[in-house]
């Protein structure tokens, strides 16, 4: 701020308004509108925008969102009464972009949908056709065939039962961010088919059953996240958290 003053330039600022997130921002009151107007009158501040944040836009019940929009509109009116015009108004996050046509205003803030992922299962997906932008691939580094009764990986938590099991070792593990919780539960894609993970996932390797996938060889591409043929594994399926945001921002 002081540097801008010395340069005789204005610092652009966006006013935060608390409409129900109870995180940051001015309250929607006459007093706080007065304070915001004082900021707008400062010689080296240009009040370029005003924003708030939806707390429940990705839920089916939009009652709370309606209350937030009403508060935001009221703050806009309170500032207008004080001669303050806001050029850039923004309230819509990813779910808001999909749900509220009348409150997109001059700017929106796309988050999770930038990754091609829906904010939740409760938004109206038909309004926006999203394609996941994330993919994660590795390679087969070893292939072997074993008989029945053979333990796989740490603790031998998986023991082969078939007369012959073909096992491919994949160069990826929990040190790369792959969830170890998917040991003996998850799958990868090879040649457009699902290959179940067998045994515990190691630090930088995992074993998968490719008995039913013909011609798997070393250096074959393994899809951990993404699409191969008609099969898809999304980042949401990979992680056990109910929110896709944990995986896209970690």
Predicted regions and their residues:
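Conserved small/polar residues in nucleotide/adenosyl-binding loops
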Residues: 1-5, 239-244
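Short, well-ordered loop/turn sites that connect or cap secondary structure elements
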Residues: 181-182, 189, 216
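Short, Lys/Arg- and Gly-enriched loop/turn segments at beta-strand edges
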Residues: 229-238
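Active-site loop/helix belt of alpha/beta enzymes
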Residues: 6-12, 18-139, 143-147
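Functionally critical, mid-to-C-terminal surface segments that flank or help form catalytic/ligand
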Residues: 133-184
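Short, surface-exposed secondary-structure boundary micro-motifs
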Residues: 173-175, 193, 200, 224-228
């Amino acid at each position: 701020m002081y540097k801008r003053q010395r340069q005789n330039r204005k610092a652009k600022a966006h006013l935060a308004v608390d409409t129900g997130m109870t995180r940051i921002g001015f309250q929607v009151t006459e007093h706080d509108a007065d304070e915001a107007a004082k900021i707008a009158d400062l010689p080296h501040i240009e009040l370029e925008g005003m924003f708030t944040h939806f707390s429940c836009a990705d839920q089916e019940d939009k009652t709370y969102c309606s209350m937030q929009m009403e508060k935001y509109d009221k703050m806009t009116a309170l500032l207008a009464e004080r001669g303050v015009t806001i050029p850039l108004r923004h309230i819509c996050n990813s779910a808001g972009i999909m749900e509220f046509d009348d409150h997109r205003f001059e700017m929106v803030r796309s988050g999770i949908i930038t990754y091609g992922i829906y904010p939740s299962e409760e938004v109206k997906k038909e309004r926006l056709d999203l394609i996941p932008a994330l993919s994660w691939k590795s390679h087969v580094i070893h292939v072997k065939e074993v008989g029945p009764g053979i333990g796989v990986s740490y603790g031998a938590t998986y023991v082969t039962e078939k007369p012959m099991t073909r096992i491919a070792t994949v160069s990826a593990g929990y040190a790369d961010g792959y969830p170890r919780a998917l040991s003996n539960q998850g799958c990868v894609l090879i040649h457009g088919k699902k290959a179940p993970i067998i045994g515990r996932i190691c630090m930088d390797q995992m074993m998968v059953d490719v008995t039913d996938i013909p011609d798997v060889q070393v250096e074959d591409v393994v899809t951990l996240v993404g699409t191969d043929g008609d099969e898809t594994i999304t980042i949401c399926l990979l992680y056990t958290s109910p929110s896709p945001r944990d995986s896209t921002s970690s």
